[in-house]
Amino acid sequence: MRDEDLVVMGFVRGAFGIKGWVKIHADTEYADGLFDYPTWWLGKNGSWKPYAFENGAVQPKALAAKLEGVDDRDAAEALRGTQIAIPRSELPEAGDGEYYWADLIGLSVVNQQGETLGKVDSLLETGANDVLVVKGGDGQQRLIPFVDQYVLEVVPAEGRILVDWGLDY
């Protein structure tokens, strides 16, 4: 499976117990949203391998999942840090004005004055709204709330996001 055919939805945090379960961090709207997909693609650095999802549980501090072929703690621990992706073709279409985080990461962020603030490095979920983590070429990091007041236009096809945000913020 090619990188462009997959959408990263989370990552494996480590082993959970001794029977091959893994702790996961999901970047989905609903914490257990990954449990809806029968096959997960796990990988690092563009090398992906499919795993059949067998079972899942919502734990107080993490999600836990059992994947086919991962049968002991050592096998689960070996997956620590791998990304979890789902084929784009299996995901629902994003609604108008909605975006998958994976589609925003790497986009250039430009303000109304035409100044480049940097590229989207990641996003944060705060509860009230999502926040763009923008890293500039100068190493400066900016946190821009992903709300209409500040994010004026998102154009993935052009690789950019237009914001109402100053260089000095």
From Swiss-Prot:
Subcellular location: Cytoplasm
GO molecular function, one term: ribosome binding
Entries under Pfam families matching the protein: PRC_RimM, RimM
Annotated GO biological process: ribosomal small subunit biogenesis; rRNA processing
Domain of life, source organism: Bacteria
Domain PRC barrel: 96-169
A cellular component annotation (GO) from this entry: ribosome
Keyword set, alphabetical order: Chaperone, Cytoplasm, Ribosome biogenesis, rRNA processing
Principal place of residence: cytoplasm
Domain notes: The PRC barrel domain binds ribosomal protein uS19.
Assembly behavior: Binds ribosomal protein uS19.
Family note: Belongs to the RimM family.
Cited NCBIfam families: 16S_RimM (TIGR02273)
Stated role: An accessory protein needed during the final step in the assembly of 30S ribosomal subunit, possibly for assembly of the head region. Essential for efficient processing of 16S rRNA. May be needed both before and after RbfA during the maturation of 16S rRNA. It has affinity for free ribosomal 30S subunits but not for 70S ribosomes.
HAMAP family: Ribosome_mat_RimM
Name of the protein in question: Ribosome maturation factor RimM
Originating organism: Chromobacterium violaceum (strain ATCC 12472 / DSM 30191 / JCM 1249 / CCUG 213 / NBRC 12614 / NCIMB 9131 / NCTC 9757 / MK)
Record gene name: rimM
